[in-house]
Amino acid sequence: MTELTGKRALVTGSKSGIGFAIAKRLVQAGAEIILHARSDSAEVEEAKMKLAKLTTQGVSIALGDFSDPKSCRSIFEKIKKDNKPIDILVNNAAIQPVCALADMSSSDISQMLEINLQIPIMMTRYFAEYSEKGGSILNICSIEGLTPALNHSHYASSKAGLINFTKASALELGSKNIRVNSICPGLIERQNLDKDWPQGVKSWLEKAPLKRLGAGNDIANAALFLVSDAASFITGANLVVDGGMECVPSW
């Protein structure tokens, strides 16, 4: 029931990292994929080439700079013009700067809330507007939306907002046969993570019940389930994929 043959999916922020892992998993399940990136680059073309080797469905690219909210409508207008509506939307694109509250400017806050919260809201709105037969929306949130980390107050707030927006939009869009769910990833392995944040990685490995970092595939497998017909009676849900870290007592 996790087969996606005949489905078309748009994954934002999908040239690398979690977004690419999700796009790859959906392709492997039979979906036709639209990769999204801010601008064209060798990395985007390489991502497209890697996915194209896995499918005969074709892989396309949607470019849109999310610092401009108008790009959301532009992406969906192009999809409509191509006369190939999408069935699945994964709102993955986000930013995660580290900044102490005392050093935070109003522009820092505005940028964070615009890209991490306003853009997924607008993408959801246009998905619903252009949808012909319903579908599935998945918001990639963070465990920081549940338990914040030091110097991440604006990031944690944006993700907490997205978790609640998931529930609110699921309530509103159910009558249109649109399901909306979210995933809260834990610490996911990436290149140079142990060099960029050695103490954080060390602490995670000591505390996490499964004693490992997450991988992109861990999030991708959860994403596949939630956007597929296997989850046809699930909407407004938030799935925590963190190796059990949420269970660790803080006392």
Language-model segments: residues:
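Short C-terminal tail/terminal secondary-structure segment
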Residues: 3, 147, 224, 235-251
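Substrate-binding pocket helix/loop in short-chain dehydrogenase/reductase
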Residues: 100-101, 108-113, 193, 204
